[in-house]
């Protein structure tokens, strides 16, 4: 009986592990945009989008957090930023605060693994801006 119970427990643990591994994640990155051409490895596709649409060449990762989809989480970032993500009818509601002050509240639709870039907040250095990049990951 103990052997059967052990096998059953192992099977349940394996099923739970497989189920959680199959869950999609929401990756949220805080990125600093600057005039120079420095790009953090892994942000090349984001930098290409930025360069086509905005007068910035540099794209540096400041911080990165994530949560399980469907999203319902508040993520804390460096610099006093907090990003709340909630899945609503297929879209993701996003609220961004800095030091508890509301900066932005919007809704975005995430498709496949295409990054969605939101923000444009003061990045501290002359002309630098902070943006958040939201992207589904498998």
Where do the language-model regions lie?
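Outer membrane pore-forming secretion/assembly proteins and partners of Gram-negative envelopes
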Residues: 21-138
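Bacterial N-terminal signal peptides
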Residues: 9-16
């Amino acid at each position: 009986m103990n052997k059967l119970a052990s096998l059953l427990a192992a099977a349940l643990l394996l099923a739970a592990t497989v189920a959680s591994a199959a869950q999609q994640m929401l990756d949220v990155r805080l990125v600093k945009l600057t005039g120079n051409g420095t790009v953090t490895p892994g942000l090349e596709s984001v930098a290409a989008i930025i360069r086509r649409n905005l007068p910035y060449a540099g794209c540096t990762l400041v911080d990165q957090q994530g949560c399980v989809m469907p999203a319902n989480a508040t993520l804390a970032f460096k610099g006093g930023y907090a990003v709340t993500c909630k899945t609503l009818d297929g879209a993701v509601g996003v609220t961004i605060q800095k030091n508890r002050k509301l900066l932005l509240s919007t809704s975005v639709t995430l498709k496949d693994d295409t990054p969605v870039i939101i923000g444009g907040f003061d990045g501290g250095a002359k002309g630098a801006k902070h943006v958040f990049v939201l992207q589904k990951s498998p």
